[in-house]
């Protein structure tokens, strides 16, 4: 018998989040000070984008963009893939695998409530 493990039991929360008008420099500072590799971008608590360390390297550093004049909206990945809070860890694993993601935003009623990472999934599988 396989026990169904729900995402909300293993997700990281609370989640640092930013709005699309924040400067890239401020977003990087939040990521650095919080020791996180992802920042969801929200509007009315609903995820509209996501910024990862990889996004910053590819879209900012490599292109020599001004960190103070560029806002988060200009570098974020729009329409991020989300997963519902009551989905199973197996569903999260499938979504991560199919999309080559290491993180998924967790929503409840369309609003951001957490993040689940590949590391979280590995911890569940090894428990």
Residue ranges of model-derived segments:
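Tandem CBS (Bateman) regulatory domains
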Residues: 1-14, 28, 52-82, 88-97, ...
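Short charge-dense sequence patches
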Residues: 2-12, 21-26, 40-47, 102
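Glycine-/small-residue-rich active-site loops that bind phosphorylated ligands and cofactors
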Residues: 16, 23, 48, 81, ...
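The conserved cystathionine-beta-synthase
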Residues: 18-35, 42, 83-100, 107, ...
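A glycine-centered beta-loop-beta connector
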Residues: 31-34, 39-55, 96, 104-119
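Short, charged/polar low-complexity linear motifs in solvent-exposed/disordered segments
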Residues: 35-37, 66-68, 76-77, 86, ...
